[in-house]
Amino acid sequence: VLFEYMETIWNNSPILRDICDGNSGPRRDVDRCVMRINDSRVTCLPLGDGQKIRGQRANDIISDEFASIPRDIFETVVAGFAAVSSDPIENVKRLAAEKKAKELGVEIQDKDDNKLEDKDNQIILSGTAYYDFNHFATYWKRWKSIIKSQGDPTKLREVFGGEDVPDNFDWKEYSIMRIPYELLPEGFMDASQVARSKATVHAGIYQMEFGACFTRD
């Protein structure tokens, strides 16, 4: 679905196509779909059992319809895509320099202008809400607890099951967004179909599909 949106944007944007090089644009292959915009690349992969996509690397991961992705495949395969730094060699050099400077008592001034470039790899979990027992709901609750902790060590220790909080953990790097039907721009969805669903389907299913709520069975 995401790749189809990319194709639509590309096909309907003549100015975008004009400012991109000849290698840019969407491409569908047997085992993947790739969208290139100059030096940037988006790769869409079919998960399967996870074996054929092992070893992939990514700066940013979007796991769409997360409730339908087997938890073990996400945690053992997909999440590992972002385990390596976006520029591992430069990152190793920078950390080594900072460590040595600290030993020598030399202060290294932060480069505020490059804060966006220094951001760690990102993972986005998205999709339609599902039942409360699903791992999507589990992740949502965990991330919400992290955000509500406001960095309090005691509360974070509870989130981590009583274990110490990792040294490089930053609660500010987590966010959650809930977008129910009522917050969408008017006309974005067929209002009559939404009304029909609200009148005919189970309230729990309606809340999952249109209310962005995890439902208990």
Regions found by a protein language model. Name each.
Residues 2-3, 70-74:
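Phosphate/oxyanion-binding active-site loops and adjacent basic polyanion-contact surfaces
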Residues 49, 68-69:
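Residues immediately C-terminal
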Residues 62-65:
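Walker B catalytic acidic pair
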Residues 2-59:
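Inter-Walker segment of RecA-like/P-loop motor cores
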Residues 21, 72-217:
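Non-catalytic, compositionally simple segments
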